[in-house]
Amino acid sequence: MQSKGTIISIQFLLRFLLLWVLIGKSHTEEDIIITTKNGKVRGMNLPVLDGTVTAFLGIPYAQPPLGRLRFKKPQFLTKWSDIWNATKHANSCYQNADQSFPGFPGSEMWNPNTDLSEDCLYLNVWSPTPKPKNATVMIWIYGGGFQTGTSSLPVYDGKFLARVERVIVVSMNYRVGALGFLALPGNPEIPGNMGLFDQQLALQWVQKNIAAFGGNPKSVTLFGESAGAGSVSLHLLSPRSQPLFTRAILQSGSSNAPWAVMSLDEAKNRTLTLAKFIGCSKENDTEIIKCLRNKDPQEILLNELLVVPSDTLLSVNFGPVVDGDFLTDMPDTLLQLGQFKKTQILVGVNKDEGTAFLVYGAPGFSKDNDSIITRKEFQEGLKIYFPGVSEFGREAILFYYVDLLDDQRAEKYREALDDVLGDYNIICPALEFTTKFSELGNNAFFYYFEHRSSQLPWPEWMGVMHGYEIEFVFGLPLERRVNYTRAEEILSRSIMNYWANFAKYGNPNGTQNNSTRWPAFRSTDQKYLTLNAESPKVYTKLRAQQCRFWTLFFPKVLEMTGNIDEAEREWRAGFYRWNNYMMDWKNQFNDYTSKKESCAGL
């Protein structure tokens, strides 16, 4: 039986513990209520590794673009009086989900995981604990071809990066597809680039408010992947964006890529085509806009897919345009003139950038087999991916990427089409962007990511795919419940450190002397660092010959064959057919010779 003294001691201990819990609870709640320029927001503490991170999810940064605000630039937010509960992700912006492979995690992981709504202009903040003072800020911009994407995806969770590197991570939703990029250039009611103006307003929000979260508005680095990287590089070119950030990281995308910016005429034609499809063909722009604003967003989504021919792949239906406001000229021109923010950039690409696009309609390709394609299927693939290119242009690609190599392996056409798409759309534009940037004396760093994740659900032949460095940038391999390897955790920690060092100091090496120094990229030697699970190495002039083909030779071929008459066209077509016959004969003869030699040895 317990003594009276023991009971009193236990009661005292319980009261003390209860008091400690209450004090701790109130202290924690007080810590996670932040006062912004628009009002107070409540966040939450998340356990991360051996500590915590404070997360604020779903903070509004603009008025909902509803009704008369549809298709317009985002409007500044008014103040609220209550405490905004920022403890769960907000709506995703309206978009078409990828339904090509239902239930397959490789494609489903990129689909929106919150409700779709036009009321979607919200951002997220992850801050290390205890609350920092003047911490570097890293703002993530998601990709998705300007057609899809949301900041709430698990692969974009900022908690590990905030915890390990003690930076503040911010991400925002922005409008995509027709609702974000429909354009009647020159008309303020539907100016185009609304999604980019959304991003820009989020950057302004960070400048005004991030100090309240412990961040330094004078140390802000933008980073993004694919169309997100294209967006980041457009902010480098946009005079109104340039004062709103410090540095930039571009992962597998740049604004000078062929898909990143469309002409004014093309943008207007697509807007009028969409209007026609949904019954909004009117006599003037005012009536068209009024009609489009009254349409259900789901109807707009369904019809925006029809604007580009179905046999065209890798097409951005609605994307950035030269509006004279956000973007004053084509990116190539601005780069040539040196009209971009003078700062430091970190740029890079993945080893197999093209494969992710091949399983979405290229002849002979499938995620369920090895996709060993024929010469004819390769040629059909070129027609789909280069719809406006002449036969002679496509034959030049075939000759350079296949015939010139005299490769006898069965995989040669599959690998060649991967290289063609990756070089043309991602790798060579990124290298060209970095080269132009560095020529004016700006510090640039370039990486080549070559590790295939052990958790990748796509088939082995697809290699180190477009988009699959992101999980390492955000530290997902540090999550013990997911079965990444120890080497992958080390790689992820290394990449997070490189990215954070660059954000803090403008140099991925930081202030420490590591075993392998990441050298600056100069236009003369073009040094770059490989990122893998073994050991990083420094090389020079990545894909230099292939990029010369796209920047120098290929445009000349198109120029020289653009105006040939029909007789010469027929003669050349006949010559190429003869050349194909000769290639087949050569292959059969080599096969015959090989068999003859093997028989002679019997």
Swiss-Prot record:
One of its GO terms (molecular function) is cholinesterase activity. InterPro entries: AB_hydrolase_fold, AChE-related_enzymes, AChE_tetra, CarbesteraseB, Carboxylesterase_B_AS, Carboxylesterase_B_CS, Cholinesterase. GO terms for cellular component: extracellular space; plasma membrane. Gene3D superfamilies: alpha/beta hydrolase. GO terms for biological process: acetylcholine catabolic process; choline metabolic process. Glycans are attached at N85, N134, N269, N284, N369, N483, N509, N513, N514. It is an enzyme of class 3 (hydrolase). Its EC number is 3.1.1.8. It catalyses: an acylcholine + H2O = a carboxylate + choline + H(+). Keywords: Disulfide bond, Glycoprotein, Hydrolase, Phosphoprotein, Secreted, Serine esterase, Signal. Substrate binds at G144, G145. PANTHER family: ACETYLCHOLINESTERASE, CHOLINESTERASE. Esterase with broad substrate specificity. Contributes to the inactivation of the neurotransmitter acetylcholine. Can degrade neurotoxic organophosphate esters. This is Cholinesterase.
